[in-house]
Amino acid sequence: MDKVVSSPTEAVADISDGATLAVGGFGLCGIPSVLIAELQAKGVGDLECVSNNCGVDDWGLGLLLAGGQIRRMVSSYVGENKEFARQYLSGELEVELTPQGTLAEKLRAGGAGIAGFWTRTGVGTQIADGGLPWRYDDAGNIAVASPAKETRSFAVASRRADGSTVTEEHEFVLEEAIATDFALVRAWKGDRHGNLVFRTTSRNFNPLCAMAGRVTIAEVEELVEPGELDPDAIHLPGIYVQRVVELTPEQAADKRIEKRTITPTRDSSKEGV
């Protein structure tokens, strides 16, 4: 089945106000920047977005945030976006902060049809006990706080250094899976059937977001014909992808660097002094 659509505009045509979106990428690596820009131009609003980050002030999801198009974020690391902090603290934006590994597993579980899972991450904190500020009012008071989650003790076996096994009781918290109306992802390569290959860091969250979306839209830097991708090299099978958008060379090359770091040039004239 050929899943290629003619343009980003066509790809996001049925995303409407109030939709929930899982958006791939890690930092600015592998973010579906073209699809995000299309949503910005479309003016769709009241969105709930699930993403590890929220872009920066002028790129990625930061564009939707600046336009007031996002109502709620479920995220892990958001410290690079000043507008995000302003909207959160002023009560304009609701934020559910989630541990990064937990967020990844919630997305994976949603894609696998698993309702929830038990984890030790967050036990003994506001993640499990509740009270984490989700939304402030305009006076800086907590208007909406996270609810307490179900916890339970399980016997966990572990192996000691001497080879013996010990069983201990540990407390776990129940985390519910995440499934969204749509998922937006970016792939390095993809074929017309929606099979995708991600490059380096962009593989961190893109496959998981794609799994969690009921309708997954992938923008691909290079489109190939079915059969050209090595089956063993495919990171995400096409069963999870409903639409594919081929980027132009200019769109594929338009990538931002969040923090530019370089190695200082070595002054060889001072060596051996």
Give each language-model segment a name.
Residues M1-V273:
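Conserved alpha/beta enzyme-core scaffold
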